[in-house]
């Protein structure tokens, strides 16, 4: 699917339409939650919802600007989703954030007696479904929540949504790469990293 077929034009994009499409960032789901209706570009004939990558591009910029207000060590990146683990960890390591990949231990944000207890100021999750526990705890602690959301996700308790395919390996690599690059730019740092640096070989 080319940009001409979708008819999308981006204003000062982080990457080209073609690069977003090649990574599959626009590929949504066949199930829709009304919370995500504003992020739908169109519905394909087979019932697949296409994500509006114009809004993806805008939201990545917005989230990076928001995160740049925080000390990196106060940002907590969490993902249980397999394909999100490598790029999320890369993002956290690059900017100096806290991270947790794999199964989230209940109480990590709420029980100071746990060995892995952390006290961040803001939380980023890869999927509100798989990462529901950390969202619940962040809300209990009054922390803002940023989430990568697909068309089937509910966004209650999410403060900032990045609309994206949050199931595909390449899509997650692209979004975390762009978030890293834009965050560093907000901090006045020019990065030579490429999206390939965020792609796991597995």
From Swiss-Prot:
Transmembrane segments: none annotated. HAMAP family: Ribosomal_uS2_A. GO terms for molecular function: structural constituent of ribosome. Belongs to the universal ribosomal protein uS2 family. One of its GO terms (biological process) is translation. Keywords: Ribonucleoprotein, Ribosomal protein. This is Small ribosomal subunit protein uS2. GO terms for cellular component: small ribosomal subunit. PANTHER family: 40S RIBOSOMAL PROTEIN SA. SUPFAM superfamilies: Ribosomal protein S2 (SSF52313). NCBIfam families: uS2_euk_arch. Pfam families: Ribosomal_S2. The keyword rRNA-binding does not apply.
